Amino acid sequence: MKKIIGISANEVVDAGEVLHHLPISYLPAGYVRAVQEVGGTPLVLPISQPKEAKTYIDLVDKLILTGGQNVSPSLYSSNQSSEALSLLERDLFEIALIEEAIKQKKPIFGVCRGMQLLNVYLGGTLHQDLSLRQPERIKHMQSPIERWVATHDIFFEKDSILTQIYGSRTTVNSFHFQSVDQLGTDLKVTAKSDDHIIESIESSTDKHRILGVQWHPDFSYNVNDKEKGVFDFIVNSF
């Protein structure tokens, strides 16, 4: 029987002229296609009230938290930079999804922002703006380089479950302004970049099954077998 994979959606208030400036709920197709190609059934979870989280988690076997806006600094820091690139409504709903998934002992895979939000939920903090770190050795927001192009190396710890897919090192894409700073409770760091940015985290306890990556396998699953392999692992083994 196919696994049902809940995938968190995003929202925009004005979709532009092509879509008549409508407000839309949306999800980058890479997540959907990757889950389908490895044998899962994707179920899109639109931003909703936190009280609806249980209804959604009851429907799924596993949860994917997707990329998108920055996590609201108000959730982890008293020293806030601009909230302009965040969406608190989304943060609060996805935090409720995390809480319910953990309660139901369902695995969670966080991508980019999704990994950061998992860390914040478990009491960790984030670097709010990597461009302020001096010197900036690696460009962690690689745009305008195409999204599927891998631009920097990362290095895995020997005990990472991802070594079975990537080996001890791999090269990944990079599209983020924020990154994990102080690690949340019951998590361990399992990969870093050359400039010591945390690139993957995993559960350090059997209280929950959590895996997070800072890069976007959804951008390159169709051109890189390893990135497709991580979706295969999430859907069929995690």
Language-model region placement:
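Active-site loop->helix "elbow" adjoining a glycine-rich segment at hydrolase catalytic centers
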Residues: R113-M115, L122
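N-terminal beta1-alpha1 cap of cysteine-dependent amidohydrolase-like domains
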Residues: M1-F109, V120, H127, S131-T163, ...
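Active-site-proximal beta-strand elements of phosphoester/diester hydrolases
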Residues: L211-Q214
